[in-house]
Amino acid sequence: MATVTTHASASIFRPCTSKPRFLTGSSGRLNRDLSFTSIGSSAKTSSFKVEAKKGEWLPGLASPDYLTGSLAGDNGFDPLGLAEDPENLKWFVQAELVNGRWAMLGVAGMLLPEVFTKIGIINVPEWYDAGKEQYFASSSTLFVIEFILFHYVEIRRWQDIKNPGSVNQDPIFKQYSLPKGEVGYPGGIFNPLNFAPTQEAKEKELANGRLAMLAFLGFVVQHNVTGKGPFENLLQHLSDPWHNTIVQTFN
């Protein structure tokens, strides 16, 4: 008969004394020692160590050489080799950052109005009917205006990626300018609470942005399948959790 004893470092049981590696950006490691002790005159102990290193999205799978783990959110995941070109990598880093921010705003804009309408605070259409509303201009006119404005913004953002700091000065109102900073984190008026772009904050923002992009895709697919919004689907599921599920929906 044998007993299995698990020995863990004290830091595991004191989460307040240390932060996870993916939050701190350090090359932290997770150590677990397992000891197997046989009851008898002679006890034998064996142990092994498991290490989770920065830049390994799957432990044991080597990351590409061009992904060193120095970037926020870099876990070595690039199966198609899209970031092998350094110039492409610069663009992908900023593209993911901006799309994640838009996704977080979009998901909040899809979910919160539906929730507030359901509880009677406001009365607005669902996100999928918002385009049917009558605005101060036609939808085609608004599309053209939006296209021109976003084209201007994206051109300047690309210039900032190619030559950091080159667009900090307002081209029209010369008295306004942004402080020098890292690309993608302009500061100034875009950072009213004066949050510092620490490695921990960058990791959290990217994690939430990636989750929001998946949530946005899920909301769109969910509506195409059920014809309802995310909050309505949640309420329907909670009313009968064993029968109102994705299984019954596809059946």
UniProtKB/Swiss-Prot annotation:
Binding site for chlorophyll b 2: R101, V144
Annotated keywords: Chlorophyll, Chloroplast, Chromophore, Magnesium, Membrane, Metal-binding, Phosphoprotein, Photosynthesis, Photosystem I, Plastid, Thylakoid, Transit peptide, Transmembrane, Transmembrane helix
Phosphoserine: modified positions: S35
GO BP terms: photosynthesis, light harvesting in photosystem I; response to cold; response to high light intensity; response to low light intensity stimulus
InterPro entries per record: Chloro_AB-bd_pln (IPR001344), Chloroa_b-bind (IPR022796)
Sites where the protein binds chlorophyll b 4: R157
Localization per Swiss-Prot or TrEMBL: Plastid, Chloroplast thylakoid membrane
Post-translational modification: Photoregulated by reversible phosphorylation of its threonine residues.
Note: Light emission at 715-720 nm upon excitation at 440 and 475 nm, and subsequent transfer of excitation energy to the photosystem I core with a relative slow rate of 25 nsec(-1).
Protein name in UniProt: Chlorophyll a-b binding protein 4, chloroplastic
